Amino acid sequence: MQAMRFNFRTLCRNAAERGGQMQRRLLDALEARHTVKTLPEFGIERAAQLAGCTANHIRNLETRGDLPQPRLVDAGSIQRRIYNYNEVNRLRAAIGKRPSRPAGASCVRIVFSNLKGGVAKTTMSLHFAQYLAREGYRVLLVDADPQATTTGAFGFIPDLDLGDGDDLFPALTEAPELIAHAIKQTHWDSLDLIPARLALQYTDWRLSQPEERQNDSLGPPPVRLHRALKTLEDRYDLIVVDTPPSLGMLSLNAIAAANLIVMPIVPHMYDISSSVQYFRILEQICALYEREINVQRLCILLTKVDGSTETLNNIAVINGAYGELLLSNRMGLTKELQKSASDQLSIYEIDQPRGSRDTYNRAIMMLDGVNSEILLAARQIWQQEVLSGIEAGEAHHAGATS
């Protein structure tokens, strides 16, 4: 009896066909429950707190017609005003309290990056971008991870809602200006998204080909995202980039585009060892592309922190090695994040806690603490740029008058 020969190509073709049928069934099920995402709603006191004014001031603006009439919901025998974050931003604009980058400062590009997966890069980049939008800034969130988890968090189903041209690939391989065609509006008025698809992983292979290194019009493959994002700078105050858990061309492009790198680390020994290798690779990248890279600050964010003795000992080790790079705020383990993520929501988007109110409040406090510290680092980059511009102007004036 002749032994059956194993045919790997046939196996792959058959598996792809069966997988395609499975994928179509899954997409049909997803489409059936595909809903429009909305923001949480709250009362006038919370709206006033966020906007930095009093509730009476809001009422007066609405009465005079300086703001649209509020939405009302029945609350027993009375009607209650309700607002969301988008309406708070319109309120900020009406009273002159909408924040923005300083005059003379450029858009800051913040990249969440690490070689290792499972360190909460996507969780933190998503919540940081939404925090910035909640605070009133104009924000672009770039999903550079082919897993497209960030994209899914905004209600986009990559294989259903997105097609060719709806990710970074054209901007990195054809023309930097094409990045504008990939921008999607989200349910946050001041937060736009450049989504990802599984097909984006082809970018790593494409950019590593010899002919790409010889493409003078697009420039060196690792710096093309920087050039593409520069075409969007006038639109946004801050750009946030989520990266894949590897150091291929997509991650290299994100690093080369960054002003500020946030490096999440879980305080475990494997993650500490990975961080050493990460810094060695970053040093090599800087040596190769020194003129193109403009990273002005790197911050290490400890994530998934618990109170165990082992974790505390590891934090002491990390602090001894990287103390000046560590953010003072840390992101602890919280079930509220896990529960909201299972509903494809962020903590900032849920109306009611999935667990206890205390757990929810602790999660919000941790996120706000981390995000405000990262925003402070971005503001310091703005301040340094403005100061450098003033000094350059004074030096030019002194030279012209001497």
Where are the predicted features?
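P-loop NTP-binding core
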Residues: 1-46, 50, 55-402
